[in-house]
């Protein structure tokens, strides 16, 4: 049983051609057949089937189906579901069980979604390949010797492999968009504050945003509409009115659309196949009536440096709570309080997490705060000003999602700087807080997926999804 979109699934459910239980069982069986790909850290066999039966029973009794009636969804394992393990793919939280639902979980349940499992990820969302998980790497469904991207690699792989119709991820610097590009699906990071972060385990609080991974922009828009909106439990959530995304998407046309193309995104190090596919897609849109506008985004070379200074500083603070005293892993090798703190964190955290904590502690230290952290914040403001100015002249900024296609498992693990460059095109949207999306545009010479990255102005998710839909529809 396979559905290419939620609309197809919903039509079958409402027509009585299938049931929520049959659909859920089909997805769970497929997950079991793909267990060697290490996509899921937990599968909710009994809970998912029980919920599906409950939805079927209510529908048969005349109940009104919710907007996501029967939608099989996978959830990244840094989002809280009451009664389920919440590991963040880390040994330090290996046996921790969440005691509450995240706001997004509550809202999805209220619209009759079915959660089928928690997906693998880079530990505490720190990584670009899903190789930093304490529970092993995830295989890319297109080539199991290659990475699916990260940190939401499990969620992206689940959707790409047909193990979930839609999945949730979190995006700090590209962790939804980059794996979407590597797995040939749509990955949306909304405007910062569009979706409540209550119940999302924090990596870098001024960057983190829950995002959506789906096979098409229509499904992404539907789920976004359910989750979006202010939340009194998250002071950073925005009270900006939630749009009718379907209407805004329908209003988008290639005719007269102004697409900004930054020269900084097409440098010599860009993979030739990626450059060719992106330019071909832009030319295709130009032929349909869009206008390609050459733009420049000064300071782009500083994006990665500023980003890693800021997010590691925030991570060093956020992860201080994992100390072995209150919850999570506690080292047995300690005879005093200080040893408990040190040993629990040393044994519980992985290599990349410890690297980022140490870097963040360093840039926040008294002698280096002004030299690094303060300057990075100033660069962030420059980026916000430059992107705001650019989007006053164009409707969308377009470029590659990643400088290269999916790489082999283990290829970049010994070179963290090279790994960080995987996010060079996605980081700017996170720095400024604007909505961004990766949309599949074709395949390279090795038949590996390539994605295009789009950025719109604050709270223009409807326009962004509409443009993504134009691009994706033209390759189907």
From Swiss-Prot:
Intrachain S-S bonds: none
Keywords assigned by UniProt, alphabetized: ATP-binding, Ligase, Nucleotide-binding, Protein biosynthesis
GO molecular function: ATP binding; glutaminyl-tRNA synthase (glutamine-hydrolyzing) activity
Nucleus listed as a keyword: no
Entry's family note: Belongs to the amidase family. GatA subfamily.
GO biological process: translation
Subunit structure: Heterotrimer of A, B and C subunits.
EC number(s) recorded for this UniProt protein: 6.3.5.7
GO annotation, cellular component aspect: glutamyl-tRNA(Gln) amidotransferase complex
Name recorded for this polypeptide: Glutamyl-tRNA(Gln) amidotransferase subunit A
SUPFAM superfamilies membership: Amidase signature (AS) enzymes
Record InterPro entries: Amidase, Amidase_CS, Amidase_dom, AS_sf, GatA
Catalytic activity: L-glutamyl-tRNA(Gln) + L-glutamine + ATP + H2O = L-glutaminyl-tRNA(Gln) + L-glutamate + ADP + phosphate + H(+)
Purpose: Allows the formation of correctly charged Gln-tRNA(Gln) through the transamidation of misacylated Glu-tRNA(Gln) in organisms which lack glutaminyl-tRNA synthetase. The reaction takes place in the presence of glutamine and ATP through an activated gamma-phospho-Glu-tRNA(Gln).
Active site: 76 (charge relay system), 151 (charge relay system), 175 (acyl-ester intermediate)
PANTHER family on file: GLUTAMYL-TRNA(GLN) AMIDOTRANSFERASE SUBUNIT A, TRANSAMIDASE
Gene3D superfamilies, per database record: Amidase signature (AS) domain (3.90.1300.10)
């Amino acid at each position: 049983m396979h559905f290419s979109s939620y609309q197809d699934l919903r039509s079958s459910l409402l027509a009585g051609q299938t049931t929520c239980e049959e659909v859920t069982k089909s997805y769970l069986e497929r997950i079991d057949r793909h267990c060697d790909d290490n996509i899921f850290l937990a599968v909710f066999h009994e809970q998912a089937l029980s919920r599906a039966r409950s939805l079927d029973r209510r529908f048969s009794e005349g109940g009104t189906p919710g907007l996501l009636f029967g939608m099989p969804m996978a959830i990244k394992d840094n989002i809280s579901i009451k009664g389920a393990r919440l590991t963040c793919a880390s040994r330090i939280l290996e046996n921790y069980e969440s005691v509450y639902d995240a706001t997004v979980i509550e809202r999805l349940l209220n619209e009759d979604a079915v959660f089928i499992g928690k997906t693998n990820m880079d530990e505490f969302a720190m990584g670009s390949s899903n190789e930093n998980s304490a529970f092993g790497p995830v295989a890319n469904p297109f080539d199991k010797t290659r990475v699916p991207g990260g940190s939401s690699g499990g969620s992206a792989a689940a959707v790409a492999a047909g193990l979930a119709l839609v999945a949730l991820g979190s995006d700090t610097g590209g962790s939804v968009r980059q794996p979407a590009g590597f797995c040939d699906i749509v990955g949306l990071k909304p405007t910062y504050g569009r979706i409540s972060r209550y119940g999302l385990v924090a990596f870098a609080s001024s960057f983190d945003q829950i995002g959506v991974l789906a096979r098409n922009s229509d499904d992404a828009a539907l789920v976004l509409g359910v989750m979006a909106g202010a939340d009194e439990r998250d002071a950073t959530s925005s009270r900006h009115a939630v749009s009718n995304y379907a209407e805004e998407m329908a209003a988008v046309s290639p005719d007269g659309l102004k697409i900004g193309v930054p020269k900084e995104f097409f440098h010599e190090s860009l993979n030739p196949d990626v450059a060719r596919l992106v330019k071909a897609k832009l030319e295709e849109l130009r032929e349909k009536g869009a206008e390609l506008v050459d733009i420049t985004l000064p300071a782009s070379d500083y994006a990665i440096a500023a980003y890693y200074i800021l997010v590691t500083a925030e991570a060093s603070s956020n992860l201080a709570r994992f100390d072995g005293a209150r919850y999570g892993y506690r080292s047995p090798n300690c005879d005093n309080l200080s040893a408990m703190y040190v040993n629990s964190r040393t044994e519980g955290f992985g290599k990349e997490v410890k690297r980022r904590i140490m870097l963040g502690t360093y840039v926040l230290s008294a002698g280096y705060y002004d030299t690094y952290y303060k300057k990075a914040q100033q660069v962030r403001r420059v980026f916000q000003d430059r992107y705001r100015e650019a989007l006053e002249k164009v409707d969308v900024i377009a470029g590659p999602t990643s400088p290269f296609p999916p790489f082999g498992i283990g290829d970049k693990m010994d070179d963290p700087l090279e790994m960080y460059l995987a996010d060079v095109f996605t980081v700017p949207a996170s720095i400024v807080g604007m909505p961004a999306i990766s949309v599949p545009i074709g395949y390279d010479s090795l038949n590996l997926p390539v994605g295009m990255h789009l950025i719109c102005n604050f709270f223009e998710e409807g326009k962004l999804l509409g443009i993504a839909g134009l691009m994706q529809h033209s390759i189907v």
